[in-house]
Each structure stands twice: as C-alpha cells, then as structure tokens.
Curated annotation (Swiss-Prot):
CDD domains on file: MnmA_TRMU-like
Subcellular location: Cytoplasm
GO molecular function: ATP binding; tRNA binding; tRNA-uridine 2-sulfurtransferase activity
Signal peptide limits: none
Organism for this UniProt entry: Geotalea uraniireducens (strain Rf4)
Listed name of the protein: tRNA-specific 2-thiouridylase MnmA
Site (Interaction with tRNA): residue numbering on this chain: 136, 346
Domain of life of the native organism: Bacteria
UniProt EC number: 2.8.1.13
Family per similarity comment: Belongs to the MnmA/TRMU family.
Described purpose of this protein according to its UniProt entry: Catalyzes the 2-thiolation of uridine at the wobble position (U34) of tRNA, leading to the formation of s(2)U34.
Entry annotation: catalytic residues: 111, 208
Length: 375
C-alpha cells in the first residue's frame, strides 16, 4: 500500500464514514503521522428531511462530526476546510450546466478531479504532508521505470477506479489508497476491531448535494425553471408529444415520457439547442461505439489504435473495445459488440485487465453509418 516503509506525514480525507475512518486507523497503525481533514462542500440547511428521515449522502455536518470523533478516538489532529465556494463553481455549476446542455454529468468524477486531488492536495502540501490518502477502493503500483499505475480495487463490488481516471502521475505519486486490497466486509470487520464508532454506519448512496435524488428540482432551484420546453419526436422527426424541459431527460429513460404508444419508447437523445427529445424502441439504444473528449491517459499515450476494455458508466461491466486516439485529445472507441445507452456527458474509462489506462468524457455515440472526423 505505502510507497516505501519510511514514516510519512499523511493527510487523510475523512468523510465520517467507515471507509475513510478505517483508512486513517490503518495509516496510524503503520506508524505514519496522520492528519485528518474533512471538507465542507455543501450547505445542508438548504434541505429539510422529514422527521425520522436521514439522507444517504456523505459530507453533511453530521458526517463531519463523526469524522471529528473518530479522529479524537485515533488521537490524530483534525481540521475542517471550507471548499463550498470552489465546490459550487467547479462541481455544482458544471452539473447544472451539463444537464442544461442536454448531457448527463458525473459530479463524483469532477469532485475527485478538482476538489480532492487538486484543492485538498494543495492544502496537504501546505501542512507539509508527504502524501494524501482516501478511502477509495482502488490501488496504485509503481513500475520499474518509476511510472505509476492506477488499478481496480480487489473487491469487484466496491471498485472505485472508474471515478479516478483523471488522476495525473504527479497526483498518483502522492496518493495512498489503504483499502484497495480489501473487501468491504474486511473493512467493516477492521472497524469493529478498532472499536470505531462508525463501524456499522450505512453507506452514502446519492449525490451529496442532491440528497433527495430529485435532479430536476435541484436544477430549477439553482437556475429557476428553464425555458427548454419543446417537442418529443421519433427518429424521423415526427412530433409525438411535448415536454417541460430537456434537462428532465437522459438517454435510456423510459418513465415520464407521457406518450401513449403501442410499444415502449425510450429516450434516444437530447438536443437542448433544438429543445427536442428523441425517442424510439429499445433496440435503437444500441451503438457501435462513441467519441470521447478531454482524454486523460494514465498509461503512456498510445500512438495507434489499441485493444482494451472500457466502462461507459460506473455500474457497467467492462466490455472489449478498440480505442483510436484522435487529434485534440479525443478518441474513437469501437465496441466489439453493440452497447446500450451510450450517454453524452458520462465518463468512459479504459482498462487493460485491472489497470486503468485512462479515460474521457462521452461526446456522442457512434454507429456504423455515423461519419467520424479523424482530423
């Protein structure tokens, strides 16, 4: 787990959950100088839960209190840093903008990219830290040539490498993932063994700043109800109905279309500029590949096409594909077999076995008849 056996000053990102708490305990047990930091990124007073209800998210004030108590139990220094403004500008605004542009964003990747492994890393350096650590289920290894590899966590049900594809070599060199070689069951057992008060705490399920999972309400609270109402059309452009806003729809969606039709209809595409939602039968959801932008290669950048596997969403089994690097930091990905619901705005992550090669953001799906510019 640790890059070498020397005692290091390590800043651990503590969410108040069982994973980061056990990671902190493991680092302390290994003899490192551990500093706990919780990031305050969101004002939870904006939401009021029903009596007896608790939102399944991370990073709330209750979670920060849990993290503080764990740090006290472990006898490590603990700080809270306020990143609310940065989180709003870098994560929330991006989330809302993507939906308004007709795409389906992944804010957890953006949070890792800009908050945890950018701002927190800078804060850690300011504290004189040698490394940062998180409770992610992922692994790193250093090759003989000094290059770092990002790898899947050994627990396939918990692997979080998909969310970390934006990491750079510099960031990987300063990052520890103490839980990467463990299963969730083993982590909970360790938490109980350490006597941590969060040993039985539930897991966060929803996006932290949308605790009730109502994206439409959140977007309208952020920006007001958008004037993006328009037509629902079939693949030939025939109007089948109307909608109240393109941001209410995502590729693959079936419910909430409000259209009477002899066969089930699914969202095939969202065109915010035209204010159109295109629908069609289930088999029309399948694509031959995709174009990805803003590619980050963790492995050396390939000069020609490579055979690999890819995931087009988090809970997606890696599928065989051929990746062709294009100009302007783009790539064309061709699947061995047609794949369902390629969704613009989501991340596509490339793998070679357990190793993350890199990844990018899905621009659009590609079908055999789709012209692709390789310029």
């Amino acid at each position: 787990m640790v890059k070498n056996n020397k005692r290091k000053r390590v800043v651990i990102a503590m969410s108040g959950g069982v994973d980061s708490s056990v990671a902190a305990a493991l680092l302390k047990e290994e003899g490192h100088e551990v500093i706990g930091i919780s990031m305050q990124v969101w004002d939870y007073t904006r939401f009021t839960a029903e009596e007896g209800e608790k939102f399944d998210t991370c990073c709330s004030l209750d979670d920060i209190h849990d993290a503080r108590r764990v740090a006290e139990q472990l006898e490590i220094p603990f700080y809270v840093v306020n990143f609310e403004e940065e989180f709003q500008n870098l994560v929330i605004d991006d989330f809302v903008n993507e939906y308004l542009l007709g795409r389906t964003p992944n804010p957890c990747v953006r949070c890792n990219q800009w908050i945890k492994f950018e701002l927190l890393l800078k804060k850690a350096r300011g504290l004189g830290a040698d490394m940062i650590a998180t409770g992610h289920y992922a692994r790193t290894e250093q090759d003989a040539d000094g290059r770092y590899r990002l790898m899947k966590g050994v627990d396939p049900a918990k692997d979080q490498s998909y969310f970390l594809f934006t990491l750079t070599q510099e960031q990987l060199a300063m990052t520890l993932f103490p839980l990467g070689g463990m299963t969730k069951q083993e982590v909970r057992a360790l938490a109980a063994g350490y006597g941590l008060r969060v040993a039985e705490k539930g897991e966060s399920q929803e996006i932290c700043f949308v605790p009730d999972n109502d994206y439409v309400r959140f977007i309208e609270e952020e920006r007001g109800k958008q004037l993006l109402s328009g037509n629902i059309v079939d693949r030939k452009g025939k109007v089948l109905g109307v909608h109240d806003g393109t941001y209410r729809y995502t590729v693959g969606q079936r419910k909430g279309l409000g259209i009477a039709h002899p066969e089930p209809l699914y969202v095939l595409g969202v065109d915010a500029a035209r204010k159109e939602v295109t629908v069609g039968p289930r088999d029309a959801l399948y694509s031959d590949g995709l174009i990805a932008t803003a590619i980050n290669w963790i492995a050396p950048t390939p000069e020609t096409a490579i055979e690999a596997s890819c995931k087009i969403r988090y809970r997606h089994h890696p599928i065989p594909c051929r990746i062709l690097p294009l100009a302007d930091n783009r790539a064309e990905v061709r699947f061995t077999e047609r794949e369902k619901s390629v969704t613009p705005g989501q991340a596509v992550v490339f793998y070679d076995g357990d190793t993350v090669l890199g990844g990018g953001w899905i621009e659009h799906a590609v079908n055999t008849k789709t012209a692709v510019s390789h310029e």
